[in-house]
Amino acid sequence: MANTSKVVKAARGHKFAVQNYNRCSRCGRARGYYRFFGMCRICIRELAHKGELPGVKKASW
């Protein structure tokens, strides 16, 4: 889990736009971020398994 201070620091933004980075809206994780969902891969997986993400289903081929 990310520290609260890191989440607040990321939300403030930087002087240069290149230095800004995304964090998961649920847990604050910085890596494995999916922009479409605004969450990290772990949170997306948890919500998808619970059926709380509409239109997302487990792949099978």
Swiss-Prot record:
Cofactor: Zn(2+)
Cofactor annotation remark: Binds 1 zinc ion per subunit.
Gene Ontology annotations of biological process type: translation
GO MF terms held by the record: rRNA binding; structural constituent of ribosome; zinc ion binding
Protein family according to the UniProt entry: Belongs to the universal ribosomal protein uS14 family. Zinc-binding uS14 subfamily.
Assembly, per entry: Part of the 30S ribosomal subunit. Contacts proteins S3 and S10.
Function as written in the Swiss-Prot or TrEMBL entry: Binds 16S rRNA, required for the assembly of 30S particles and may also be responsible for determining the conformation of the 16S rRNA at the A site.
Name assigned to this protein: Small ribosomal subunit protein uS14
